[in-house]
């Protein structure tokens, strides 16, 4: 495994996708959410979410070799989960289920900075702001992660989830 990830539980990946592609994916997802009247998310009240939107599944599979390279171990794609956060939303501190062993949170569109916090193995917490197309790859089952109350209007992001191959 990549030593940096092992020592910090995460790695910041600037421009994981081009900002233009991030904006286009956000536009497509927001249109989908509106067209199909996607309702509130169960984990984050007053946000909208959807699992395995086709544009994100394509990205999940396309990026598997790159994620494998960053991690230094072969990964298998499991699923995607996208969420549209609204003013006042927060993501409580948690770890993920086994299908999210290696996860990326990818920023697609925002109107306000909103760091994701990750707890490192030494107990230190680090907050990272992402721009459109930037990602954080982290060990979802090991690293507690969260977001404090969102002060903007809208924040669109997608999680890309993987597991390590045997």
What are these regions (language model features)?
Residues 87-146, 154-158, 163-165:
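Catalytic core of non-heme Fe(II) oxygenases with the double-stranded beta-helix
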Residues 84:
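Conserved active-site beta-strand element of glycosyltransferases/polysaccharide synthases
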Residues 72-81:
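A short coil-to-beta-strand element that immediately follows conserved catalytic motifs
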Residues 4-7, 76, 154:
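A short, polar/charged loop/turn motif at coil->beta-strand junctions and beta-hairpin connectors
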Residues 1-71:
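Non-heme Fe(II)/2-oxoglutarate
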Residues 43-46, 78, 87, 155:
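Short linear sequence motifs
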């Amino acid at each position: 495994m990549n030593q940096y990830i092992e020592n910090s539980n995460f790695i910041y990946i600037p421009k994981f996708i081009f900002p233009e592609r991030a904006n286009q994916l956000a536009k497509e997802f927001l249109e989908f959410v509106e067209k199909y009247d996607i309702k509130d998310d169960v984990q984050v009240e007053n946000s909208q979410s959807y699992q395995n939107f086709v544009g994100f599944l394509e990205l999940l599979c396309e990026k598997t070799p790159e994620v494998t390279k960053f991690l230094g171990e072969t990964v298998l794609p499991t699923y995607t989960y996208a969420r549209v956060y609204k003013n006042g939303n927060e993501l409580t501190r948690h770890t993920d289920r086994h299908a999210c062993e290696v996860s990326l949170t990818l920023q697609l569109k925002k109107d306000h900075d909103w760091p994701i916090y990750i707890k490192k193995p030494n107990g230190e917490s680090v907050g990272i702001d992402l721009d459109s197309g930037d990602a954080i790859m982290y060990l979802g089952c090991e690293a507690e992660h969260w977001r404090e109350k969102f002060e903007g209007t809208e924040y669109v992001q997608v999680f890309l989830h993987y597991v390590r191959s045997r």
